[in-house]
């Protein structure tokens, strides 16, 4: 399907610009944007992995739900989260990317600990679902627009490596280790420390959101390097 799609006008224009500079060398001209990708991704990917991959273990090991209950709750929450994505994307088209990211950051810092603490002590699948759904209403401020925000940071002809390299490294470090960090704290008898860790990661990203430009209003998507 990808091979039959038409390229965008910006990409076709970029193909006309022939340069011998390597992609990595070109990327070195954008250190600020690379750091922005890392900063805006760290908290969001940690939160995303918490409420997707780790949540199944959390519901079984900490909440005490059965396998069937865990499956129903996590699947229902994922469907709810999927529904939110285009809605939040539409909101960002109206108010800008930055404000939606800031909303995620502020709400994540304020409500991550209360949500996870309450979730740990619920007694059934329905309240568990409602709490995870509330978390998705926060996390979707990041997940719904993170890809387009990163794309809007870089000119067309280096966008793939500009987004892909720092994003992949950040997801591996902060997203891929979520389960290990959470279970590590649990094995030490301090499971709640993970809640503070996650809040701290979101807080770091919030600082980035506060000082970055709104990429909807100032996009590099149609520029050439």
Where are these regions (language model features)?
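Cytoplasmic membrane-interface "Motif A"-like loop-to-helix N-cap segments
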Residues: 94-105
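Multi-pass alpha-helical transporter architecture, strongest
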Residues: 2-3, 149, 200-225
